[in-house]
Structure formats: C-alpha cells, structure tokens
UniProtKB/Swiss-Prot annotation:
<dbReference type="InterPro" id="IPR002010">
    <property type="entry name" value="T3SS_IM_R"/>
</dbReference>
<keyword id="KW-1003">Cell membrane</keyword>
<feature type="transmembrane region" description="Helical">
    <location>
        <begin position="88"/>
        <end position="108"/>
    </location>
</feature>
<dbReference type="GO" id="GO:0006605">
    <property type="term" value="P:protein targeting"/>
</dbReference>
<feature type="transmembrane region" description="Helical">
    <location>
        <begin position="138"/>
        <end position="158"/>
    </location>
</feature>
<dbReference type="InterPro" id="IPR006304">
    <property type="entry name" value="T3SS_SpaR/YscT"/>
</dbReference>
<keyword id="KW-0812">Transmembrane</keyword>
<keyword id="KW-0614">Plasmid</keyword>
<comment type="function">
    <text>Could be involved in the secretion of an unknown factor.</text>
</comment>
<keyword id="KW-0813">Transport</keyword>
<keyword id="KW-1133">Transmembrane helix</keyword>
<dbReference type="GO" id="GO:0005886">
    <property type="term" value="C:plasma membrane"/>
</dbReference>
<feature type="transmembrane region" description="Helical">
    <location>
        <begin position="197"/>
        <end position="217"/>
    </location>
</feature>
<dbReference type="Pfam" id="PF01311">
    <property type="entry name" value="Bac_export_1"/>
</dbReference>
<keyword id="KW-0472">Membrane</keyword>
<comment type="similarity">
    <text>Belongs to the FliR/MopE/SpaR family.</text>
</comment>
<protein>
    <recommendedName>
        <fullName>Probable translocation protein y4yN</fullName>
    </recommendedName>
</protein>
Length: 272
C-alpha cells in the first residue's frame, strides 16, 4: 500500500507537531533539571535527564499540542523556539525555588569548614559535581538531597511543575511583574542566608568558644602558640559536636526541605 504525496505531507506535518509539542512539554522540566541539585549530579547523565524531562512532560502533551494550532504558520518557526526558551527559563526559575534549601545547607557546610580552619585551597573538587567544595559542604549537600528525595521532594517537584502552568501558561510570553515580585526575590536570597546561619550556628558557636578560649589562654601564657593549636583542637572536638548535633540537624534539614511545597506560592508572589 502506497501513500499519496498529500498523505505523506499530512503525516510529516503531524510528526513535526508531535515533536514540537513534546519539546515544549519537556522544556520546563528540563529547566528544573539543569539547576536543581538532585538532578545535577554527574551520575545522572544528559540522556537520563532528557528522558526524565520528556516523561515529566507527557501529561501536558495533549494541552501543548492543541495550542500549537493557534500560532500563525508563517511565524511559527520563530514563535515555537522562543516559547521553548521561555519554558526553559520558567523551569530554571522553579528549580531555583526548589533548590534554595539544598544550597543553603551546602553553604552551611562550607561555613562550618571555614570556621574550623579548612579553607577552599586545601579542599578537593566534589567528584559528583566536579565543583570546588569542602568536606562538610559535600556531606550536608548529599544528606540534604537524600532527605529531599525520601521526604517526597520529587512529588513536590512534579506538583510545582504542573501547577506552574496555571500561573504562567505555555503560550504566554510575558509574565505579570510588579515591585512586590522584586521584593519577594530578595526575600528568597535572604532565605538562603538565614538557612545557612541557622544550620551552622550551633556548630560555629562552639568552635568560636574554642577560639575565645585559646585567645584567653594566650593572654595568660604569651609563649602559648594558639594560632597553631587552635585548628587541631577544633578538628578533634568537631566530631563530638556533630555527633551530639546530628539528631537536631537532621530534623532541621527535613523541616527546611519540606518547605519546598511552597514553591508555587513563591512563583505566584514573584509574578504577581
């Protein structure tokens, strides 16, 4: 059975529309995966991320495919790629909101290591992300990702992804921006710093007490070299502090990560 040229053209047109719809449906999910630490580990390759993005976008395929009939055929070659870029940007925005607790916790690890005398030049690159990171930063980062997944973080990602279409639809280029949205954006940056200080605060406090003790000891014994002995003492006491603090730390991490359910609220405040 042979197909006529008209039927072949119809099939090709349908195939192109399907590919375009699948690409637009997966673009927002792909944007999330480009920035959310859960998906940026080197063990998750580009092929896996691409397949996951397409799978996450399948429920929206019918809606996106119906909307492809609206653009003018003469300008669709320009509109569709621009829509794809816009969708990736929205995904990056969502990934930023979802990743704030994870980045805050990793920054807390960096802050703790800096306080106990382990600075960046002496640290090795994180083998999972090929980026510069301290030992405690890597540990808290991996712990945060594990708790994020175990506490239903993937469900929160999907909920934010699908709910975002009602706030910023696929075929709307420009969002609704306001001054309040800019204030909310700075509030999110403040949230990262607040998380960092709250998580690292107790550990840094005890390490600071060691510094103060060393300075007082040097005042009464000038021959005592506190600058050389302070880092070893900190590294000896540090495991004891972390074992004592571990239970409260894990509860705090879990509480912070479960706030990822408010991603849609943040996006709505930012755009409105």
């Amino acid at each position: 059975m042979y197909l006529s040229p008209a039927e072949i053209q119809i099939l090709l047109h349908a195939a192109i529309e399907l590919v375009a719809a699948a690409g637009l449906g997966a673009a927002r999910a792909l944007g999330i995966m480009l920035i959310l630490p859960v998906f940026t580990r080197s063990q998750i390759g580009g092929l896996i991320r691409g397949c996951l993005a397409i799978a996450f976008g399948l429920p929206c395929l019918a809606h996106v495919s119906d909307g492809l009939q609206a653009p003018d055929p003469e300008t669709s070659l320009i509109q569709i790629p621009l829509l794809g870029l816009k969708e990736v940007f929205v995904g990056v925005l969502l990934g930023t909101f979802l990743g704030i607790p994870l980045w805050g916790l990793q920054a807390a690890g960096e802050f703790i290591d800096n306080q106990r005398g382990i600075t960046s030049p002496s640290t090795q690159a994180d083998p999972a992300t090929n980026s510069q990171a301290s030992a405690m930063g890597v540990f808290l980062g991996i712990t945060a990702i594990t708790i994020f997944v175990a506490a239903g973080g993937v469900e929160a990602v999907l909920s934010a992804l699908y709910g975002s279409y009602s706030i910023w639809p696929v075929y709307r280029f420009q969002p609704t921006l306001s001054t309040q949205g800019a204030v909310e954006l700075f509030g999110l940056l403040d949230h990262i710093m607040r998380t960092t200080l709250l998580v690292s605060g107790p550990v840094v406090f005890f390490l600071g007490l060691i510094d103060i003790s060393m300075m007082m000891l040097r005042r009464f014994a000038p021959q005592f070299k506190s600058g050389q002995l302070s880092p070893p003492i900190k590294n000896i006491v540090f495991p004891i502090i972390m074992v004592t603090y571990a239970t409260y730390l894990l509860e705090g991490i879990k509480l912070e990560i479960t706030q990822a359910d408010g991603t849609l609220g943040w996006l709505d405040k930012l755009l409105k």
